[in-house]
Amino acid sequence: TPLYSSAASDVYKRQGEGGPELAKAMLGKYYEIQYPEVIAVVLKGSPKPWVGPMDVALTLIGAVFKNNFVKNRVLEFIGPGVSNLSMDFRNGIDTMTTESACLSSVWATDEKTQEYFTIHHRPGDYKKIQQGALALYDGVVEIDLDTVVPMIALPFHPSNAYPLKDVIAEPLKYLGMVEEEAKRVFENNKEIHLNLKDKIFNGKIKVDQASIAGCAAGSFENICAVDQIAGKMEHGLGTFAFNIYPASQPVMTELNKTGVINDLMEYGVRVKTAFCGPCFGASDAPGNNDFCIRHSTRNFPNREGSNPANGQIASVALMDSKSIAATAFSGGFLTSAEDIVTEFHVPEYHFNEKIYDNIVYNGFGKARPETAMLYGPAIKDWPEMSTLTENLLLKVVSVIRDEVTTTDELIPSGETASYRSNPYKISEFTLIRKDPEYVGKAKEIQEFEKARVSGDVKKVETIYQILSTVGINAPASELMQTTGIGSVLYAKRPGDGSAREYAASCQKVLGGLANICIEYATKRYRSNCVNWGILPFTLAEEETDLAPDEFLYLPHIRQAVADGKKQIDAIVISPD
């Protein structure tokens, strides 16, 4: 299983991790991981025609995320129900498994898998994988596909999963729940006011926008199903905004050949190029206070492109493509695919490899070290980073008491994507949606570390004076040699969601030297912290009274790391 720099890599059967893990591998280092526990996901039966892969995925995520049942474990999909699912259906479930907090996922293979490899001109790569007669697992999740119903994940997490018919039947109850959740999520931003109850007309929820996009939704089979629902409804969209992004150029080409794209465009659907933009706010950003439905991987706060610093808020609910199509062609009123009686059939798919052969350069094993690298003026190298000193003096610059902090909150997606080649620029967005004061506070304490490195005794004297309150009275000139200065972030469970290493590297660029939490939401994020030289501390207590602007003094921390100590002592120093 190769490493891949994306949390959504499950669909390609790669292990999704942050970029530094790939860099280590390219340097000949090992990928370090404790042998994971394995959870059997036993599938039985067959899904109803109106049920899609997102419905199965949300059923799973809703059952296991909040109780941590599969956290950092490998999911192994087995059972008689697997053979009743097409490969597109399996991939649609698989790309969502990351949202369960699992480490990765694997599937039993069969004749359909073999056919899939043959279609993609790779018959020799197929391997039959089945569980042994005496296979043992660390836990079991059973899903009866016959009983899965159309689902909806309400804002602001895929685990907020409910049967779609329940939300349709009681709109005030469920939209009221989302409004209350928004108050909690944005409690520090008094400019945010989410009012979803305004979306209820004559007892029905009116949606503002719909999108189907990316690895989770843009499959050939999904989009063909949308076309067939559109044909059943026999009318156009009117003014309702419905956008579809195929998962790849080969998929788009085949949809074009079969006439599906032409059909959808005639009905008023905006069919766009292969791109996952709506998933992370890079396209189709909704209007303020809009309520959107999407078949994509995540619906975290502001991930859809709104900017809370400007008082903006929108909300995204996740649904399967079939129910999204049913809603879109019902005037935007929330509708289950179960209510649209349709016979689904999938045209034969043909993979056109020329699309990649004619555009992708395969340089593997063809090193050309003489080739000059081209750098534009906006591409910047990483700053010099200080070596870990014997002791550390850290200022608490942010305390986040949410139960889970996502990587989207640590560093937003969308508008930041264009700055990924400039570590200084992108770091300016760190925690901007959750704690707008973080960047300024981190930079303020970082100036003292810069002064320490440059030998500015006069400047660092003012920060080292705080150590005298705990009996450390050495001169600043001496402390400069032994005690580094930086910032620390506290969050209960940081790192859910994307594998993006910027969630850690941006803290480091701003002088962040440690995280403290109850537990890390994912191994990926903890590994990113380690790889960027951020100390990943945990506190067993469910709650801590650590407060912003307090200091932590960590004596002999370098030696503790070298010795592999599992517990260290720290001194909390109040600024008063």
Q: Where are the model-predicted features located?
A:
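Short hydrophobic alpha-helical runs that function as membrane-insertion/retention elements
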Residues: S105-W107, R270-T273, L513-I518, P536-L539
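Flexible inter-domain linker/hinge segments
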Residues: Q131-G132, T147-M151, F333-D408
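Short gly/pro/ser/thr-enriched loop/turn and capping motifs at secondary-structure boundaries
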Residues: T113-Q114, P250-V251, P278-G281, F300-P301, ...
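Extracellular/luminal Protease-associated
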Residues: I78-V82, T482-A521
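Mobile "lid/hinge" segments at catalytic clefts and subdomain interfaces of large enzymes
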Residues: D10-T118, G277-P278, S283-V360, V530, ...
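Acidic, glycine-rich flexible loop/linker segments
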Residues: A274, R303, E343-H345, K523-D576
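Accessory "access/gating" subregions that flank catalytic or transport cores
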Residues: G79, T98-G238, I244-G259, D263-E266, ...
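Single conserved hydrophobic/aromatic residue that forms the stacking wall/gate
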Residues: T1-A8, Y12
